[in-house]
Curated annotation (Swiss-Prot):
Keywords: Ribonucleoprotein, Ribosomal protein, RNA-binding, rRNA-binding. It comes from Mycoplasma mobile (strain ATCC 43663 / 163K / NCTC 11711). Located on the platform of the 30S subunit, it bridges several disparate RNA helices of the 16S rRNA. Forms part of the Shine-Dalgarno cleft in the 70S ribosome. Residues 124-134 have a biased composition (Basic residues). Belongs to the universal ribosomal protein uS11 family. HAMAP family: Ribosomal_uS11. This is Small ribosomal subunit protein uS11.
């Protein structure tokens, strides 16, 4: 009989990153928070879907705050103290995520909105029809 090989989880290398960048990508469906060093190498991330929310609950500001909390805890293990925040998207979890970073003791040096704005590019998607069901 062949011996089954079990894969062991790799040990996470602890980096000593004091200053970094917090990327908050907030869409209409989800909020993704990623922490990277100044060169852009991501070392901690989380999203509303990754912490267990599904469907319409992912787009709430509360879910964005919980996703930010999970990402900040991972980032603090690497020694993160201060960040530059880059906000992208038009979702409702953008401000909640930024406030949660500040509330968890990370110093925010700068807040920058990097939402891409088209200069009359491709045609936008059609509008969502909302009907009154009575």
């Amino acid at each position: 009989m062949a011996v089954k090989k079990t894969k062991s989880k790799q040990k996470v290398k602890r980096k000593n990153i004091v200053s970094g960048v917090a990327h908050i990508h907030s869409t209409h469906q989800n909020t993704i928070v990623a922490f990277s060093d100044e060169a852009g190498n991501v070392f901690a991330w989380s999203s509303a879907g990754a912490i267990g929310y599904k469907g319409t609950k992912k787009k709430t500001p509360y879910a964005a705050g919980l996703a930010t909390t999970a990402a900040v805890e991972k980032a603090k293990e690497h020694g993160l103290k201060e960040v530059r925040v880059e906000l992208k998207g038009t979702g409702s979890g953008k401000d909640a995520a930024r406030k949660q970073i500040e509330a968890l003791g990370i110093i925010i040096k700068e807040v920058k909105d990097v939402t891409p704005i088209p200069h009359n590019g491709t045609r936008p998607p059609k509008k969502v029809l909302k009907r009154d069901l009575k």
